[in-house]
Amino acid sequence: MTKLNDKAPSLATTLAHLLRQEPELLSFDSARLANALWQRMADEKILTPRLSTPTNTQTYPYTEIVKAAAYLSHQSGLPGLAMTWLAQQRLIEIIAQCENSVIKDTYLADLIAGNTLSALAVSEPKVGAHPKHLNTRADKVGDTYRLNGEKTYVTNGLNAAFFIVFAITDVVDKRKQFTAFIVPKDSKGLSISPLHGFDALKPSTHCTLLLDDCELPDSHILGDIGKAFDDISKPFREYEDVMMLAPLAGAMQSLIDQLCAHDAELIANDNLGQLLAITESVEVLSSQAASQLEQANPHTNPISLIITGRLLVEHFNQTIKQLSAEQPLNDAIKRLIKDIEVLSNIAQSVNKIKQINLAIHYRQQELT
């Protein structure tokens, strides 16, 4: 991993200083999120590093954020922790940038202070997050909306104070129009259940939501009616695709460290050199992709960097699987191997589509 330079203060060095001074912040029950860590990061003004507030005018570029996320994942050995930090940053920005004063007045202060979390609820059972197949509806009844449907794989759902739920509010020319609703966890008609069979990426939690005539006033609408997919979901997915390379890079380095500490002879030098090279390459690709995301320039699309990074992680996983087969590994190492595999598989089908689109674009250019 990139060495941190205390003489050149950055987001990563500020985070490193905090964790060195208060190492207990990474010693928490893995079944729940590290609330104390979020609150202390908020105190140090690094919980939302891109969000300028009256008390915090210092903001950081995406390249600084991915470096800090890789460091957090490396030091904790918990890519789910860094994943949660990155996701919350973007969700908090969405709340902060919305024009709905009721939503901002109700939730923003606690989010920025690290006192609470939010959760994005888009995916549905058996169909994933593809808008064509989503079915959760929000029907207008008088001055309220009545939500019915089911959501799954809701990240941090068991720890969230509220959910950003996508629901169909109209169909125009056979295209479903989605609106985002703020649904408090104690809403009548909302049932929250742990996602059974999913045991990875702790301390993040995952759950399912059942909405059964869940009524909400129109003051709970986040953003424009019918535009949630284009305005919230697509930009969030682009952000997530780029930023999640960093927790992977940090976790991969943590796994190498733990395997070598567990058994110095487990990995031969040629294989170790390969794993280290892959990890460093993923970190570099993460930084380059983040830099392109910062530019928001259509001519500097980070898709190729993301695809390459994920292919490298896939090769890393295959090598680790071969090296660790039938080896007596401890629970922490087994958990980390699983976490890296699960995190790298998120949006794998979307990544495959991007590869195909690159090929199609190339062939079309060849014909012109």
Describe each PLM feature range.
Residues 1-85, 263, 293-298, 360-368:
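Amphipathic, small/basic residue-rich leader segments at the start of a protein or domain
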Residues 79-102:
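N-terminal glycine-rich flavin-associated loop
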Residues 136-139:
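A structural signal for short hydrophobic beta-strand segments in well-ordered beta-sheet cores
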Residues 150-190:
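A short core secondary-structure module
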Residues 317-368:
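Glycine-rich phosphate/cofactor-binding loops in nucleotide/flavin-utilizing enzymes
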